[in-house]
């Protein structure tokens, strides 16, 4: 009798994706982040569901409903902080996952990569709207500042902003619709993740060398299931250390003050995982220019496959590109730091230089370095 795992219509799909999947034998721990992102997503949906049972999306009661969750609901505090810090873990895994793709040339799987870029944008939108829901000072002013950026769009900008707000300012209508979108988007992310996986399994995984590994494949289970379980345990350990010891480490103290439209906080800034993009936005003195740079800072990822000039796929044997890659990582860390600083000297000029470097490395230096490395191969 054939194994039910291989014949049952539903179990067959699971089997081909997680059990009998032929996987390169040499993929490193950098390949763990895909499964970790799946775990993060499930964790966020579950904690979010329980939070939604007690949350009210009304401007008068939103803040106190979050307080009620933390004080009166059984284990409400841990659910709330797991959700808030789970978002941070989600973005850490996302950045690692994208970084891995850039380093090892995984972007040559065009469909998988493009859906990944869409996933990144959708996740950023979801996280932004989630940050608005507690209706603290930073929630309100963050929503006001970021949605206001759309007014930079010529001709339709103002109408667009008022349409998104559902009025002439961020108010009850805005909060209600943000809650609705924040609830539905994770399920869209889940569907997109399935398509992401579907396209990946059409080609099979990349590996650190960037060389086709069809001659050396091993089954996903038990080799990589056990490796993923180790990664998952480390992820959950890190998350619980954050939640139980320093739950507010990555948050903003201003968000413990209820939203007040009459009082602007001295420094409006988003969560840490948006600071690099926020720094790029602020580094351009022109409003429309800043918005374009902000959008391009993420969409530039979709251009990366077309800027690949190297004869090799991975950066494993390309020292100049490796050097540039780590400079890019340092540059992004610099931008993240600058995004959290006030707009004054010397932070302004550092932010501008780091923003120029970001686009310069990806658009100019990387392709040039690849061409130089191609020529060095002839020696």
UniProtKB/Swiss-Prot annotation:
GO terms for molecular function: metal ion binding; ubiquinol-cytochrome-c reductase activity. The chain crosses the membrane at residues 33-53, 77-98, 113-133, 178-198, 226-246, 288-308, 320-340, 347-367. Heme b b566 binds at residues 97, 196. Its main location: mitochondrion. The keyword Transmembrane applies. A ubiquinone binds at residue 201. Binds 2 heme b groups non-covalently. It is a multi-pass membrane protein. The keyword Heme applies. Its cofactor is heme b. One of its GO terms (cellular component) is respiratory chain complex III. GO terms for biological process: mitochondrial electron transport, ubiquinol to cytochrome c. Heme 1 (or BL or b562) is low-potential and absorbs at about 562 nm, and heme 2 (or BH or b566) is high-potential and absorbs at about 566 nm. Component of the ubiquinol-cytochrome c reductase complex (complex III or cytochrome b-c1 complex) that is part of the mitochondrial respiratory chain. The b-c1 complex mediates electron transfer from ubiquinol to cytochrome c. Contributes to the generation of a proton gradient across the mitochondrial membrane that is then used for ATP synthesis. Belongs to the cytochrome b family. This is Cytochrome b. It comes from Capricornis sumatraensis.
């Amino acid at each position: 009798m054939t194994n039910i795992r291989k014949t049952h219509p539903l179990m067959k799909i699971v089997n081909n994706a997680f059990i009998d999947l032929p996987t390169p034998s040499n993929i490193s721990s950098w390949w763990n982040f895909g499964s970790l992102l799946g775990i993060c997503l499930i964790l966020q949906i579950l904690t979010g569901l329980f939070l939604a049972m007690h949350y009210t999306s009304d401007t008068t009661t939103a803040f106190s409903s979050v307080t009620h969750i933390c004080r009166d609901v059984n284990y409400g505090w841990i659910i709330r902080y797991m959700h808030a810090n789970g978002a941070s873990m989600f973005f850490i895994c996302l950045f690692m996952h994208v970084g891995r793709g850039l380093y090892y040339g995984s972007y040559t799987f065009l469909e998988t990569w493009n859906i990944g870029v869409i996933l990144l944008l959708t996740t950023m939108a979801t996280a932004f709207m989630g940050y608005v829901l507690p209706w603290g000072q930073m929630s309100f002013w963050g929503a006001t500042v970021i949605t206001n950026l759309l007014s930079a769009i010529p001709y339709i900008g103002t109408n667009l902003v008022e349409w998104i707000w559902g009025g002439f300012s961020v108010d009850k209508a805005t909060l209600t619709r943000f809650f609705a979108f924040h609830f539905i988007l994770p399920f869209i992310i889940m569907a997109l993740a399935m398509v992401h996986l579907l396209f990946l399994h059409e080609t099979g995984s990349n590996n650190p060398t960037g060389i086709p590994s069809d001659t050396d494949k091993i089954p996903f289970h038990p080799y990589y299931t056990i490796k993923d379980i180790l990664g998952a345990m480390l992820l959950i350990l890190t998350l619980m250390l954050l939640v139980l010891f320093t739950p507010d480490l990555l948050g903003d103290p201003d968000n413990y003050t209820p939203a007040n439209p009459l009082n602007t906080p001295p420094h409006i800034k988003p969560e840490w995982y948006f600071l690099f993009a926020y720094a790029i936005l602020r580094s351009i003195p022109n409003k429309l220019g800043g918005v374009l740079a902000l959008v391009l800072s993420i969409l530039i990822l979709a251009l990366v496959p077309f800027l690949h000039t190297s004869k090799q796929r991975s950066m494993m044997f390309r020292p100049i590109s490796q050097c540039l890659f780590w400079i890019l990582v340092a540059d992004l860390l610099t931008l993240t730091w600058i995004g959290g600083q006030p707009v004054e000297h010397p932070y302004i000029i550092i932010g501008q230089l780091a923003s120029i470097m970001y686009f310069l490395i990806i658009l100019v230096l990387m392709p040039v370095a690849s061409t130089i490395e191609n020529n060095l191969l002839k020696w």
